[in-house]
Amino acid sequence: GTKYSDWRISHGVKDPLNIKTWCLGNEMDGPWQLGAKTPVEYGRLAAETAKAMKLIDPTIELVSCGSSNTQMPTFPQWEATTLEHTYDYVDYVSLHQYFGNPDNDTENFLAQSMEMDHFIKTVIATCDFVKAKKRGKKDINLSFDEWNVWFHANAADDDTMKNHPWQQAPALLEDHYTFEDALVVGLLLITMIKHSDRVRMACLA
């Protein structure tokens, strides 16, 4: 076999894992990423990667990398430009969004599912625009592959990364949730269910 199939077998997994869904990168618009790309750079690279992967296995599903979050200055132009290149080869575009209440504003916090709703509608509209522009036949669906309430541990995480950067396995991202957080998570789940015709995958992060 190949180097990596032999490596898998040596770790006790004889047969291939038959993974059928692959994301073509992660948050590639982020300046904090090593290897960050412009939308054209990413779109061209992702399209060629997708073509190669589907030559090996035409049954796989591929996810085009969406914006890191809705506050990125290139959102939603990133999605529009990258899909110009990847539309013919991918099945999904990824969405990432986290929610918090650092100002202890319960009313605003409980309404943040409306922000998710607007985010989903914007990405759907962008996907459908590219479909129409390319006179395509297929819908690009959504993979909301990073979402959660996340803010309680931010200060502690920042302190760890700044003052103790070389710890082995530091305690990071360990939020302690409240009933208020649970209500918001419920509202976010309802929002995704409302759009389940296009939000086909979602991963709590």
Question: Where do the protein language model's features map onto the residues?
Answer:
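A structural signal for short coil/turn segments at secondary-structure junctions
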Residues: 57, 86, 135, 196-197
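Aromatic/acidic polysaccharide-binding cleft in carbohydrate-active enzymes
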Residues: 137-205
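Extended catalytic-interface subdomain
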Residues: 88-159, 188
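Generic recognition of stable, solvent-exposed alpha-helical segments in well-folded globular domains
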Residues: 41-44, 48, 77, 88, ...
